[in-house]
Amino acid sequence: MNWLTNVVRPKIRNILRRETPENLWIKCPDTGQLVFYKDVEQNQFVIPGSNYHMRMGAVARLRAIFDNETWYDVALPEVVADPLKFRDERKYADRIKDARTKTGAHDAVRVGFGKLETSPVVVAVQDFDFMGGSLGMAAGEAIIRGMELAVEKHAPFIMFAASGGARMQEGILSLMQMPRTTVAVQMLREAKLPYIVVLTNPTTGGVTASYAMLGDIHIAEPGALIGFAGARVIEQTIREKLPDGFQRAEYLKEHGMVDMVVHRHDLRPTLARLCRLLTKSPALTVTTAVEAPAEAAAKAEPEATTTEQPGAPAPTEPPAQPAAPQA
């Protein structure tokens, strides 16, 4: 029996584990329902039936927003990886390496430049899977670079926020990104360019105390947690019970903190419409949508395109002369 229990059974278990991928099924946090991962992925990471919005990676976000799933990865400034040589239970440098291996990203923010229903836009996405989307020096530089590019190209800037706050391992250098990004937002305003923020689950801490709540328009995904301090901290401070749904997207909309709550499937057309309205661009008609590729091929100069794929290299610079929105 010892041979059977100690040798044969573990081997059988290992075979079964190898044949079944870990992410084959996803459990809905709202209903507990098990859903096939591919179905959720094809549904933009929205659980069919319950409509629960799962977290979405940066690459998936950019694919869902840009025309033909095509964009240019914007080259971001290099920063010191571990300026304070911080260590808690583990070295901060080791945590950064693990996060980069897990996500394939350099840091928590990725910036892309491309077309949204034929209009040029700059999109920045915070990836919560990278150390909780925390705001550090690299993330701050990425956001500022994205806003500078929006000014250079005279294009709207769209920010997908998802963060637990400032990155504690970088100390005051992390907190400095709050005023720096706030100054960059002012730069967009002086250039009279739209700044649209999409608040996703969760958006908390120093991010909500800076650029995430300074947009011209604030959109929230259904059920997103949005706030500065956690609900338990607030309850302990004020010694009162908070209302149901406090800090959720719907509650914030009812109390005027966000402009609209938009389902993920409706985000792309909503963002395109807002960009057209704020830049006073003509609406995209069926005729122009059909004729645009032929006209572009006839008179436009050759323009490189990139379809982002996991693991595939992508150009790091935007095109020299993108089509500017019509006045």
Swiss-Prot record:
It is found in: Cytoplasm. GO terms for cellular component: acetate CoA-transferase complex. Transmembrane segments: none annotated. Residues 312-327 have a biased composition (Pro residues). Its EC number is 2.1.3.15. GO terms for molecular function: acetyl-CoA carboxylase activity; ATP binding; carboxyl- or carbamoyltransferase activity. Pathway: Lipid metabolism; malonyl-CoA biosynthesis; malonyl-CoA from acetyl-CoA: step 1/1. The keyword Amino-acid biosynthesis does not apply. Residues 24-293 form the CoA carboxyltransferase N-terminal domain. It catalyses: N(6)-carboxybiotinyl-L-lysyl-[protein] + acetyl-CoA = N(6)-biotinyl-L-lysyl-[protein] + malonyl-CoA. The keyword Kinase does not apply. GO terms for biological process: fatty acid biosynthetic process; malonyl-CoA biosynthetic process. InterPro entries: AcCoA_carboxyl_beta, Acetyl_CoA_COase_Trfase_b_su, ClpP/crotonase-like_dom_sf, COA_CT_N. Component of the acetyl coenzyme A carboxylase (ACC) complex. Biotin carboxylase (BC) catalyzes the carboxylation of biotin on its carrier protein (BCCP) and then the CO(2) group is transferred by the transcarboxylase to acetyl-CoA to form malonyl-CoA. Belongs to the AccD/PCCB family. PANTHER family: ACETYL-COENZYME A CARBOXYLASE CARBOXYL TRANSFERASE SUBUNIT BETA, CHLOROPLASTIC. This is Acetyl-coenzyme A carboxylase carboxyl transferase subunit beta. It comes from Rhodopseudomonas palustris (strain ATCC BAA-98 / CGA009). The gene is accD.
